[in-house]
Structures are given as C-alpha cells and as structure tokens.
C-alpha cells in the first residue's frame, strides 16, 4: 500500500510525519514532491536515470533566496555547520529536509542516492520515484514508505492520478491560524507575497520593483530582501490557504471514500494516542511495538493563537478570506 499525508502547509503535517517515523518499519519521506519541478515531477515522458538525478538534486530557488538572507526555516535541518554545503548555497532539494530525516550523514546518503538513480533505466518520473523508494526501504531496513509534503493539498489531484491505489490522510488546522503561521514563516512569506502581489511596508508595489531575481546576491534593499522584511496583509495568506482547500476538495471527487481520511491537528495534539491508533488502522500499518507511545511524547501542545493579536479590521478580512475553506472542513 502507498500512503500519503496531505495538507495545506503549517497544518501540523510535519509533526505527524515525525510521529509516524517512530514506527520502526516506517520510511517517512519528508518534502519530496513539493520542491520538484512541477512540470517534470510526474511527466509521462521517459527520462534517463541521470536526468532523474538532476531533477531531485536541483535547488529550490525560493528556499535558497530565503536562506541566503539569513532567515531560519525550522523544517530545513541540513547540518550547514558540519555538512559540505553552507547556508545560502544552492542546496540540492533532497538535502533540504528529506535525507537529513533519514540519516545522520545526509551528504553520504545523497551520494549513494545519486549513484543508485543514475543506474535507473529510461522511464517516466513516477517509475523513478517508486524505484527510489524501494531502494531506500532496502538500504535503510524499512518495511513501508509514506510521503508528506507541505502544501500538497494544492496538487492533491496529481497525487490521486499518479497513485491510483494509495491512501491519503488529510490533516488540517484552523484556517486563520494556519494562514498567520505562514505569514511568520519566510519560506511561505516570499512565494505567497509574490503570487498575490502583496504590498510592501513602505507602500511600494511588487510591480514597481522591476524584475525579481531569486538568484541575485542580497544587498538589504534588493526586491527579495524587501519582500521578506515586510509584513504582508494576513488576508492574502488566508486566500492562499483557502485556495488550497478548494483545490483539494475538488480533487476528492475522483477518490473512493475508503482511500481518504481526515484528522484535525487540534485532535492529534490533544488526544495523540487515540488519533494515532485510528491513523494506524486507516493506513493498515504493521505491528510496531510501542511506537505510538514514543510518538505521543513528541507533542508540545497547540501553538498559542495569533488571531487575537490582529486589529479588528485585519481579523475580519482574514476570517472572510478563509471562510469558504472553513466551511468545507466543518470548521464554520
């Protein structure tokens, strides 16, 4: 069985992936598909193993731009102090979060992965993904894999089409809180501000800044630095969150009910053993000892609400932007 955790981003999916990684048989794949070239990650045309290696080892320019300007991103756990790459280098995508979660020496595992995939026969990217997962299972002594990427509910339809027998667990969080978490998360702040043309703190518009070069060196006043330093309107992030929920629910029409389940982030945190037991049953996980007890120990409580910090007008605009998604999730 193929298993996926999907969500909007800033919804608790990272915690859930960490929890499921406590199962001794689990290969918990963090952040693979969301950082790959969207036009190529599931393209049907055959590609060589070398081309596939280039696909998964390419940098994600948004991530590079954020790190190059000194911002921390909690999900990026590559060991810059001891690894071969330094902060601001064009970090290969699978070294951003995936391989550091699987090995204490991600650079060495990266080299092994690259050597392995270059030997793949010409085939579509999807077949390469499956071969990579199978190799990692054998290499790391695991029994099953599950993949989780931030904002994957946005391309849920692609996952359903490409993994027609998979089961999908959707974890969701209160919309305004998820949106405000994105505002404070610079790897979300940059792309969402660019997508929706968020105004800068000084009143400038993105359209007035000229061409945006994600690869340009930071100067402090370059357009990317100015976007990252500004506080964009929370309602734009509510709109982004809501758009993802709408995209995901449209894709549900093509999925059998027994292949889909939902869990609230708040329930996972408040009743972790009960919720994890239900997730294990849905995913038909094999017996794994006391992994649920260990996983429950990872909970640190629900983050403090940010909504009360907003001025009334901002809060009303944010809640309005999120309303359609909240209704679909049964939260309004």
Please provide the spans of the model-predicted regions.
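Conserved phosphate-donor/acceptor-positioning beta-strand/loop module used by diverse small-molecule
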Residues: 148-149, 159-184
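A short acidic, amphipathic alpha-helical/loop segment
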Residues: 15, 155-161
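Short His-Asn-centered micro-motif
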Residues: 6-8, 146-152, 172-173, 265
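A conserved segment at the C-terminal end of the G1
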Residues: 14-26
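Conserved nucleotide-binding/hydrolysis micro-motifs of P-loop NTPases
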Residues: 34, 173-177, 268-269
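PAPS-dependent sulfation machinery
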Residues: 32-145, 195, 204-225
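PAPS-dependent sulfotransferases, especially Golgi type II membrane carbohydrate sulfotransferases
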Residues: 1-9, 57-58, 78-84, 121-123, ...
């Amino acid at each position: 069985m193929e298993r996926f955790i999907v969500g909007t981003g800033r919804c608790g999916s990272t915690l859930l992936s960490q929890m499921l990684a406590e199962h001794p048989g689990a290969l918990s794949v963090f952040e693979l598909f969301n950082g790959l070239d969207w036009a190529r990650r599931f393209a049907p045309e055959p590609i060589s193993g070398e081309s596939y290696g280039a696909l998964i080892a390419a940098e994600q320019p948004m991530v590079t731009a954020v790190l190059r300007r000194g911002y921390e991103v909690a999900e990026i756990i590559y060991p810059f102090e001891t690894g071969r790459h330094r902060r601001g280098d064009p970090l290969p995508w699978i070294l951003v979060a995936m391989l550091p979660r699987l090995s204490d020496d991600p650079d060495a595992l990266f080299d092994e992965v690259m050597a392995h995939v270059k030997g793949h026969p010409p085939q579509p990217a999807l077949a390469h993904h499956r071969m990579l997962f199978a190799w990692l299972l054998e290499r790391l002594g695991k029994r099953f894999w599950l993949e989780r990427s931030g904002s994957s509910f946005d391309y849920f339809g692609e996952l359903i089409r490409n993994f027609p027998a998979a089961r999908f667990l959707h974890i969701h969080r209160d919309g305004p809180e998820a949106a405000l978490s994105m505002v404070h998360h610079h790897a979300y702040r940059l792309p969402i501000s660019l997508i929706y043309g968020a105004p800068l703190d000084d009143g400038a518009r993105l359209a007035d800044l000229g061409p945006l070069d994600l690869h340009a060196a930071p100067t402090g006043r370059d357009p990317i630095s100015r976007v990252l330093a500004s506080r964009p309107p929370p309602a734009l992030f509510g709109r982004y969150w809501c758009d993802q929920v709408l995209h995901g629910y449209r894709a549900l029409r093509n999925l059998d009910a027994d292949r889909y389940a939902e869990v609230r982030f708040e329930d996972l945190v408040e009743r972790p053993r009960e919720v994890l037991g239900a997730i294990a049953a849905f995913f038909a996980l094999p017996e794994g000892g006391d992994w649920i007890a260990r996983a429950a120990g990872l909970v640190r409580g629900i983050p403090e609400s940010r909504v009360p910090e907003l001025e009334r007008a901002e809060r009303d605009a944010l809640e309005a932007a999120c309303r359609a998604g909240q209704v679909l999730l049964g939260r309004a």
